[in-house]
Regions:
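Terminal, membrane-proximal amphipathic helices
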Residues: 1-66, 85-204
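Short coil/loop "hinge" linkers that interrupt or connect long alpha-helical coiled-coils or helical hairpins
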Residues: 66-72
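Selective recognition of hydrophobic, aromatic-rich stretches within alpha-helical transmembrane segments
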Residues: 73-82
Length: 204
C-alpha cells in the first residue's frame, strides 16, 4: 500500500465515520452524547467508549464486514479499513466529548496522527505540538495548513509501515486456532493504545 492510498483511505474512513455506515448507526455527535448521558463525567464517558471500541476491533468478522461497506480501491484490505474506521469513530467521539470541532481540518489531522499509536507524540512534537500538554480548542484552531500537510505526510509513512507489520499478523491468522487470537490481540491492543493517546491529546 502506498502513502497516497493510505491518506485516501483515512479521508474516506473519517468522512464515513462521522455519520456512520451501518444501518441505524449513530453519528459521532449522537454517539458521544449517548455515552455522556450514561456516565457521570466526560472522563468516564471516554473510558467507556474506548473499552467498547476496543472490543469491536477485536471482532474479526465484524471488522471485515464493516470494511466491505466502505467504497475503497481493491488494493485496500477490508479488515484494515474496518479497523481504521472503528478507531477513527472512537477518536472523533473523544474529540467531540471534549468540545473540539470534528469537522475542522486540524482535528481531522490530529486524529490521523493518533492512529500511529506511540509514534503520535514524536510526529506532533516535530511539528511543535506537545502531546503532554492540554491542547486548548482555540490553540488547535491556529495550527497552520502547512503544518497539517507535514503531519499528514509523516502519518501516511508511519501507517503504511504499521499496517505492513499487520500484514505479517494476517499471515499468522491463516493458522488454525492461533490465527484469530493473534489478530484479535494485535487489533485490540493497538486500539486501546490509540484511545488513550486520543484521550490525552483531545483533553478538556
Amino acid at each position: 500500500m502506498l502513502e497516497r492510498e493510505m491518506m485516501n483511505l483515512l479521508d474516506v474512513c473519517y468522512d464515513k465515520a462521522l455519520q456512520g455506515v451501518l444501518p441505524g448507526e449513530k453519528s459521532i455527535e449522537e454517539l458521544a452524547e449517548d455515552y455522556l448521558a450514561k456516565t457521570s463525567s466526560r472522563e468516564k464517558a471516554i473510558d467507556k467508549l474506548i473499552g467498547y471500541q476496543t472490543v469491536l476491533c477485536g471482532t474479526n468478522g465484524f471488522i471485515t464486514g464493516l470494511g466491505g461497506l466502505l467504497v475503497l480501491p481493491v488494493t485496500i484490505p477490508t479488515n484494515v479499513a474496518g479497523v481504521i474506521y472503528v478507531q477513527l469513530r472512537m477518536i472523533a467521539a473523544i474529540a467531540h466529548i471534549n468540545g473540539y470541532d470534528i469537522y475542522s481540518d486540524q482535528v481531522r489531522t490530529i486524529a490521523y496522527a493518533c492512529l500511529t499509536g506511540s509514534s503520535a507524540a514524536n510526529i506532533l512534537k516535530n511539528m511543535g505540538i506537545k502531546i503532554s500538554e492540554k491542547m486548548a480548542v482555540n490553540a488547535l484552531k491556529r495550527v497552520p495548513g502547512a503544518i497539517l500537510i507535514k503531519i499528514n505526510q509523516q502519518v501516511g509513512f508511519r501507517l503504511v509501515t504499521k499496517f505492513g507489520q499487520k500484514g505479517l499478523v494476517n499471515v499468522i491468522k491463516m493458522m488454525p486456532l492461533v490465527g484469530g487470537v493473534v489478530g484479535g490481540v494485535f487489533d485490540t491492543g493497538m486500539t486501546l493504545t490509540i484511545g488513550n493517546i486520543a484521550k490525552k491529546v483531545f483533553s478538556e
